[in-house]
Amino acid sequence: VIGGGSRRRNVYHLTEEGRILFDSLGEDTLKPRKSSSTGTAYGDVPQIGEVFGRSTLIQSALSLIKEHHSFILSGLPGIGKTTVGVALSNDLIAAGTTLRWSTADEFSDFEALCSRMDLPQTLPSDFEALSEYIAKQCQDEIFIFDDVHLLSQRHLSRFHAFCKQIEQLQGPKFIFIGREPLVSFEHVERLSIPPLEISQAVKLLGEFQRKEEREHIAERLGGHPLAIQLYQKEATLPEANSDIQSYVEDVVLSTLDDSTRTELDHLVLLPQPIEASKAHDDEIVGTLDDSAFLRWTSGMEKMELQHLIRYVRRSSMTK
């Protein structure tokens, strides 16, 4: 030790009793131990911060993956689908599950998605060979496919064929993540992600405002996580914030044609939930519900628009 002065050293000698005890422990105790209860994640799993208000939802997802070979996490854009997926992944890994994550885009086919999962060998190009390889090599794993709503129509049929074949071969289980509507996944068990409860949504706003003010903002933005994170104190009403207005108009409502937007605005003006049959155009209710734009009462008798959409559209209509 340089400049550390003299250092006293103690030497300890094993007794005969200690030697016997040491020998009885065996050689394995000399090797570093790796916890057998921890799984591994492969692929480009997104990084997330602290997750609020999703514990019950994650428990429901854990139950679904035990009961079904596949299911889908779905909901509005920005509602926290990927966040829930990553939080679920962390729980699965902690329980000893190996999983592989792949994020889709408009050009992805099944082979491209698998190539992003760090599989140990070059993938076979033949349909049957690839299915059998994945089913055998990854039998006890879970594959997570994010943004499946981006898959193009020309790749969807082959994607579903692979998934079906691997299920028949008792291969890895699948978790799909995507925004509604997801017509091609109608056959898959669904877990819809709702807005956050206001008591949890306020946690996204930090502690810089009074509790009552934070609750007001979270309520006006419908407990929508991304909208709350986009909020900046520049407008009298949270829903009039320019970033939030642009997000709802350009992203959330981007899948609706002009006629559907017109019918949506009839619901915007309603002061309270109504029965679906009493809507201005009851046929449009199904379209909006497929896109996760509606909130239903507990008995599913009445519906209204998601609060984020309702308040933002009302604000833009009064300009």
Where are these regions (language model features)?
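Amphipathic alpha-helical "lid/sensor" segments that cap RecA-like P-loop NTPase cores
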Residues: I198, G206-D250, R261, G299
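Winged-helix-like regulatory helical subdomains adjacent to P-loop NTPase cores
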Residues: L237-D282, G286-T287
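C-terminal leucine-rich, beta-strand-based interaction scaffolds used for sensing/assembly
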Residues: E275-K319
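Walker A/P-loop nucleotide-binding motif
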Residues: H68-G85
